[in-house]
Amino acid sequence: MDLYFSYISSYSQKVLLGLYEKNVAFTPHLVDLTSQEERARFREFYPFGKVPLLVRDDGRMIPESSIILEYLDQTFPQSPRLIPADQEDARQVRLLDRMCDLYLNDPVVSMILESWKPEPQQDSEVMDKAAERVGLMYRFLGDHLSGRDFLAGNQFTMADCAAIPPLYFAKTFADFSSVGQLQDYWDRVSQRPAVIRMWREAEPYVRALMGE
């Protein structure tokens, strides 16, 4: 099983968290998204050119982070289960996963891309709108986490895989230390071995991306 990914891709980080949590072996293929030549080569292999991309041993391609995690959870049912067996609990996990992708990750990516532009070219409306959406998710997550260790309850799930990468980038632009439940959650998940491993591997690439 092969994974094509980039450490600077939050959706790749999301899948890596799932793989590391479940301790699933895979062959890594790092795609340099900063290289036009490498992106072009990857598009020859996968025309949509998006990472992460999981390729099974039989050659079948499985794209899109949430679909990859669903496949992993069904194929490797060992603990932790990223999607609960109970249908209602599973719907809740999928909803939270989707919300984190749309209302946290996407606006954070918009903020990052806008911040790379020379200051006179930055669109303040784009930044303000993205910051508003991120703030809304901060408040939602802070309230939602009350009485919960993780987003979907007391078990780590796909929803947490979706939340952790964009939260890392988001705090660069909008501090959430005053959102009590959210900060407590961040402190808690940051101690998980899978999270520590993923950030240890990704940090040099992320720092270079952010110009640190």
Regions found by a protein language model. Give the residues of each.
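GST-like domain detector, emphasizing the conserved glutathione-binding G-site
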Residues: M1-D128, G142
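A local structural micro-motif
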Residues: T27, P80, G153, R197-M198
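Short, solvent-exposed turn/loop segments enriched in Gly/Ser/Thr/Pro and often Arg
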Residues: D32, M158, A202-E203
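Short beta-strand(s) of the beta-wing in winged-helix/HTH DNA-binding folds
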Residues: P52-V55, L151, I196
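GST-like fold's C-terminal all-alpha helical module
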Residues: C100-P193
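Terminal-tail/helix-coil boundary detector
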Residues: R200-E212
